[in-house]
Design a protein with these regions (language model features):
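Generic alpha-helix structural propensity
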Residues: 38-41, 45, 62, 78, ...
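C-terminal auxiliary extensions adjacent to catalytic cores
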Residues: 2-29, 33-38, 42, 46-54, ...
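FAD-binding core of FAD-dependent oxidoreductases
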Residues: 61-83, 90-115, 143-165, 180, ...
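Cysteine-centered functional microenvironments
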Residues: 142-147, 323-327
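Glycine-rich loops and low-complexity Gly/Arg-rich segments
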Residues: 85-89, 134, 168-169, 225-227
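Glycine-rich, flexible loop motifs
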Residues: 2-57, 87-143, 234
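A broadly conserved amphipathic alpha-helix scaffold signal in soluble, globular proteins
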Residues: 128-135, 155-158, 162, 224
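Conserved, non-catalytic sequence blocks in retroelement Pol enzymes and Pol-derived host proteins
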Residues: 119, 148-150, 385
Length: 515
């Protein structure tokens, strides 16, 4: 058996999907740049057209003028070559944590894909070097704070422009290095950015878009995992599976809601009406799970559309139409679609946290868990009084849920006039994307805790005299989980197991519904 080499992602050849960015961010696929001569000539034509305008002393924003409100300031031709370095230099003021390696790769992929449209006036050499950064895993150290999301992600992307020029720092082979040293080691000459090239690199939405791709992928897996956890909790709490009847959902046919109900039926092995239970209706966190999770499921389609259109767009300013010999000044750097998508996603995901938190609250409370021990403790009767099982885990889950819900405040409504009122309406899309990532982190923590607790609940229920065999999908999941998370009989610190579960979620370890 041979290891199959994955097909490379060829920039400049086709539109990218979120899955392409995820694969690039995880170093799962190689990259190449379109080698077709006609394509390369088209890229070159944009840079040549700009040079011809300079020869004619044409006025081009950010090339022969200052930036932002300084666009009324003419830059003499003898200073035009120096302007790109000034742009990335004065924007070197980012703060906050550095983007991690996965996020940085996603940013590089998003910026390269945008510039490969050939309407930004950059040389093929710039595209080649960006692709080489991805290929060799040379990762600019990018502070995550400092963007208002219009004009694009200027400050964070200045770190891309600077490192391509051999300045500032990169992460390379696990070490924090000077970009100039890494260039020397790889035998590269640092780029000297030509007129418009620093602006083309920086004046776009690559940071928010790269983060949005990662957030979408995490939310998609979380949706499936939350559905599986719900099915396990239906078993642990002796819930009523008729709440997920296919005929019931035909009466209110939201597609995502119907999909989640179908997944639950499959997990619970329901293919026919079941015998009536003593409890006609479960609490909402079980009964209405398809209605909560279905909103996220239905939203994934339009979220994908917003993100992928942005990903595959030319989103800087000005746009260089070399064919028509025109320079088009506009506002494609405005990240409004990503801002709205991420503000919406964090609301959708926080509702998943709230749902799972409520399910865990039922599991640990002997007044509502239908015969399970208090706090899901597996201790024998003579030691029950000193064992507390999942009590603290449930408290922690409440804290994580509260923080997730707090972070759902939309970022896009906090537009601030800035840059001498030139940027008087801005998207805050990068803040929205960062918020969405944080809400996902917190919700994954809730999911990890609830998953381990649900598995404990299923185990405890299986010990009852009237226990039924687990449906196949849940039996397989229970067996997989038991290998990592043995039953809690005597109290033990669960931090390590929670962290392991989070890593399993990050790795998409369990094959779930749509995979």
């Amino acid at each position: 058996m041979t290891n199959q080499v994955p097909e490379p992602v060829t920039f400049g050849e086709r539109a990218l999907q979120i899955e392409d960015v995820l694969a690039l961010a995880n170093r799962q696929v190689p990259t190449v740049l379109q080698s077709d001569s006609a394509y390369r000539q088209r890229i070159a034509k944009g840079a040549q057209f700009l040079d011809s305008l300079l020869d004619k002393e044409g006025v081009i924003y950010g090339v022969t003028t200052g930036y932002g409100d300084s666009c009324v300031v003419a830059v003499p031709l003898q200073h035009v070559e120096a302007l790109p370095r000034h742009l990335y230099t004065f924007h070197g003021c980012g703060l906050g944590k550095l983007l991690d390696a996965q996020a940085t790769r996603a940013v590089l992929a998003a910026r390269l894909q945008s510039l490969c449209h050939g309407v930004s006036g950059v040389r093929i050499e710039l595209l080649e070097r960006l692709q080489a950064f991805l290929d060799q895993d040379v990762l600019p150290l990018i502070p995550e704070e400092g963007s208002v999301g219009a004009s694009g992600d200027l400050t964070p992307l200045s770190y891309v422009a600077a490192t391509l020029s051999g300045e500032r720092e990169v992460m390379f082979r696990g070490e924090r290095r000077q970009s100039s040293d890494v260039h020397r080691e790889l035998g590269w000459d640092p780029l000297v950015l030509r007129p418009k090239e620093a602006l083309a690199l920086m004046n776009g939405t690559a940071v928010m878009t790269g983060l949005a791709c990662l957030a979408f992928a995490r939310a998609d897996y979380l949706l499936q995992l939350a559905t599986r956890i719900t099915a396990m909790n239906v078993v642990a709490l002796q819930g009523n599976p008729e709440h997920f009847d296919e005929r019931l959902f035909a009466a209110k046919p939201h597609p995502g809601q119907m999909q989640v109900a179908a997944w639950l039926r499959k997990d619970l092995a329901i293919d026919a009406p079941t015998a009536p239970l003593h409890r006609l209706q479960d609490r909402y966190s079980l009964r209405c799970a398809p209605h909560v999770l279905g909103v996220l499921a239905d939203s994934l389609n339009w979220l994908r559309s917003f993100i992928e259109i942005e990903l595959n767009s030319a989103n800087d300013n000005p746009i260089i139409d070399a064919e028509a010999e025109r320079v088009l000044h506009g506002g494609h750097f405005y990240g409004g679609h990503i801002a709205f998508a991420m503000d919406s996603l964090k609301n959708l995901v926080a509702n998943v946290a709230d749902l799972l938190d409520r399910q865990l609250a039922l599991l640990v409370d002997e007044r509502y868990n239908h015969g399970l021990p208090s706090n899901l403790s597996g201790a024998p009767a003579d030691r029950a009084m000193i064992n507390h099982g999942f009590k603290a885990v449930q408290i922690g889950t409440s804290a994580w849920t509260a923080e997730a819900l707090k972070n759902t405040m939309p970022a896009s409504v906090f537009s601030r006039s800035t840059e001498c009122h030139n940027q008087d309406k801005v998207s805050m899309g990068t803040i929205a994307a960062r918020d969405a990532i944080r809400v996902l982190e917190l919700t994954e923590q809730v999911a990890a805790a609830t998953l381990i607790a649900a598995n404990q609940g299923v185990w405890l229920r299986s010990k009852a005299a009237d226990a039924r065999p687990l449906p196949p999908a849940l039996a397989a999941m229970h067996e997989q989980l038991a290998a990592d998370f043995p039953p809690v009989i005597e109290d033990r610190a669960l931090e390590g197991e929670l962290r392991l579960c989070l890593q399993r979620i990050a790795d998409r370890h369990w094959r779930l519904h749509a995979q």
